[in-house]
Regions:
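Acidic-enriched, low-complexity/disordered segments with a strong bias for Aspartate over Glutamate
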Residues: 22, 42, 51, 79, ...
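Conserved SAM/SAH cofactor-binding pocket of Class I
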Residues: 117-196
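N-terminal auxiliary segments of SAM/dcSAM-dependent transferases
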Residues: 2-96
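Class I SAM-dependent transferase core
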Residues: 85-130
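Short, Lys/Arg-enriched charge-dense amphipathic segments
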Residues: 51-55, 104-109, 158-164
Length: 196
């Protein structure tokens, strides 16, 4: 188990997420089919932050400030191809939070998904928590957490400071979840559910 405080891989993700939030970045992630259609009809090269971190389009190095490029490199999430760069992380808005997850297309075996089902799941959690709130000091365990929006949504809807544990067998998911807990300004634990 690891604390959800930023580590060498998550720290640059947290910095990037905070910078995006301060820049006013917002992106609601559509279905993969919608994503493919939009990218097929619009210019393929990114022109702004939403194109880079939402639509997962390749971009010229000059489109991002040096610190953002450094954070992507430090996290191992920057691709160089054909004279353009591509982010291997995408950031999506859910309520007032930003969540880091895998860039489109999510075809790798360790891809961390986020999309319309995530929004429905978070909405269900918020409605259930409003109908039957947890007591202060509650423990929240999100198994198969992915990027962590379920557990984080439950913790944000809980009065007081619940103990949050996010578990997943995918190490990439735990990196994103750890960064997302920190981005939400929360304390929590991330665990590989096989070894913990």
């Amino acid at each position: 188990m690891t604390s959800a405080t930023p580590t060498s891989l998550t720290h640059p993700l947290v910095k990037l997420g905070l910078w995006l939030r301060d820049s006013g970045y917002r992106f609601v992630t559509p279905t993969p089919l919608t994503h493919a259609r939009v990218n097929a009809r619009d210019a393929l090269e990114a022109r702004n932050l939403r194109d880079i971190f939402g639509w997962s389009r390749p971009f010229k190095e000059t489109l991002l400030p040096a610190p953002a490029l450094i954070w992507l490199e430090q996290a191992g999430l920057l691709d160089h191809s054909g004279g353009l760069l591509a982010s291997k992380v995408r950031f999506s808005s859910l309520g007032d939070q930003l969540y880091a997850h895998s860039a489109y297309p999510t075809t790798d075996a360790d891809s961390v998904f986020f999309g319309p089902d995530t929004y429905r799941f978070a909405n269900l959690i918020e409605n259930e928590m409003a109908a039957q709130p947890l007591l202060p000091g509650a423990r929240i365990l999100d198994i198969g957490c992915g990027a962590g929006p379920g557990g984080i949504s439950a913790a944000l809807a809980t009065i007081g400071s619940p103990h949050l544990t996010l578990a997943d067998i995918n190490p990439t998911a735990l990196i994103f979840a750890q960064a997302n807990v920190a981005l939400a300004g929360m304390d929590g634990t991330c665990a590989n559910s096989i070894n913990s």
